[in-house]
Amino acid sequence: MAPIALLSVSNKHGIVSLAESLHRMHGFQLLSSGGTAKVLEDAGLPVTRVAEHTGAAEILGGRVKTLHPRVHGGILAMRGDPDHEVDLEQHQIPPIDVVVVNLYPFRETVANPQVSWETAIENIDIGGPAMVRAAAKNHAHVAVLTRPDQYDRFLVALSDGVDGQLRRELALEAFEHTAAYDVAISHWMGVRLSEQASQWLEAIPLRQRLRYGENPHQQAAWYSAPKQGWGGAIQLQGKELSTNNLLDLEAALATVREFGYGTDGAHQAVQDAAVVVKHTNPCGVAIGTGVASALSRALDADRVSAFGGIVALNGLVDATTARELTSLFLECVVAPGFEPEAREILASKANLRLLELAPGAVDAAGRDHIRTILGGVLVQDQDDQLIDPTSWTVASKRAPTAEENDDLTFAWRLVRHVRSNAIVVARAGQSLGVGAGQMNRVGSARLALEAAGDQARGAVLASDGFFPFDDTVRLAANHGIRAVIQPGGSKRDADSIAVCDEFGLAMVLTGKRHFLH
């Protein structure tokens, strides 16, 4: 009896060439249904329809096609088992040797936020997962293929005889395939039915194993959804990305997106902006008239810290910008695009990692912010709500000037991307000093003001949390700061406001805290 291959795929890439090889080179009988059968028949291949094989017509508009003992019995039968052999003979069920199945495109369907409940439900595959799981369970006797990129490897192995190791690997990939499918369904339903699902599930495929983690003695791997977020990034040149590179790139991108991200249409940047990050904290941020101008100002904000940093730009990188990027040692640059001349210039820095990340990939990423704790995960929304200056209140006697208002808005956009306790000193669309990660707020203020130096005079100061005492505002006033922005909400707000009035500072309360841990 000729071996049988059952083929039923949603993704039909490569299916004809696979079927041709199975039939013409290895003598397989082809068993198929629905659209896959038609594709194979149109290619001139002899196909036995599943309905003909089972003697049962497809019913319920195609919802029931392969759920039949002559299909599942043929897949699950253990060769050489006397009882199974008797059952196969008694019920005239031929064994099925290869199962090639991938599933209805549920994840792709629900990627459209406007998809209806009914459309999503119709894209939940039933027969496909049942066949995949059956074949994976019986992998000692059946090979199961769930992705087109497995076809060539399998055909090469088939010529020499498929060994047990390959069957086990294919079975693992099959169970990963169905598990990810079920997770996608339950996650989508959970989000649609409740803000907080009873289980948090997400299946994210491995993108690459990293050389090491944050330190050389730590193992690490990068898991990423294809075409979503960093999974949609294209590395144009440079060394392999590291764990620390990715963490810093994430921080840099989040910061630069405060000013828009993209080059045209719906993704046009609101202001040309550049961000330099070290150890996940922005050390230089600026806006400018053009990306090159913004980059120059961001680097000038703290050239010492910028050495070995990560840069994010929110617009197209041209030749002028590229020359600025080559002026000092950098680890990575991410932008929505690079002009050909810029690529040529940057090629002189062979180790510099260039990443092109399209705005569409950024938009496709989910809004969950996930961190692990011992034995679990914490899931929260991203802190990315639009900043609305019209909701702010002036607490001091003096209101900020129009110029100070612009600076306060800029500093407030930046401070929520600095590790708490966070203080930012800024002026004219440029960070002048950043105080990050100190255990008390006045300590962060000292760092930011020291970094700003004489430029602090006439600048503004932003704080991610309220002032528990008036010491930070008093320190700011002594350094010449002219306006302060903070959430408010301290029992001693009046003390800090009084210091502002004493020194003629303007104070704005946002009513919203932005801790970052």
Curated annotation (Swiss-Prot):
Gene: purH
EC number: 2.1.2.3, 3.5.4.10
Family matches, as PROSITE patterns: MGS
Keyword Transferase: yes
Pfam families listed in its UniProt record: AICARFT_IMPCHas, MGS
Biological pathway: Purine metabolism; IMP biosynthesis via de novo pathway; 5-formamido-1-(5-phospho-D-ribosyl)imidazole-4-carboxamide from 5-amino-1-(5-phospho-D-ribosyl)imidazole-4-carboxamide (10-formyl THF route): step 1/1; Purine metabolism; IMP biosynthesis via de novo pathway; IMP from 5-formamido-1-(5-phospho-D-ribosyl)imidazole-4-carboxamide: step 1/1
Boundaries of every MGS-like domain copy: 1-146
Domain comment in the entry: The IMP cyclohydrolase activity resides in the N-terminal region.
Protein name listed in UniProt: Bifunctional purine biosynthesis protein PurH
GO cellular component terms given for this protein: cytosol
Domain of life where this protein originates: Bacteria
Reactions this protein catalyses: (6R)-10-formyltetrahydrofolate + 5-amino-1-(5-phospho-beta-D-ribosyl)imidazole-4-carboxamide = 5-formamido-1-(5-phospho-D-ribosyl)imidazole-4-carboxamide + (6S)-5,6,7,8-tetrahydrofolate; IMP + H2O = 5-formamido-1-(5-phospho-D-ribosyl)imidazole-4-carboxamide
NCBIfam families: PRK00881.1, purH
GO biological process terms, semicolon-separated: 'de novo' IMP biosynthetic process
Originating organism: Prochlorococcus marinus (strain MIT 9303)
A GO molecular function held by the record: phosphoribosylaminoimidazolecarboxamide formyltransferase activity
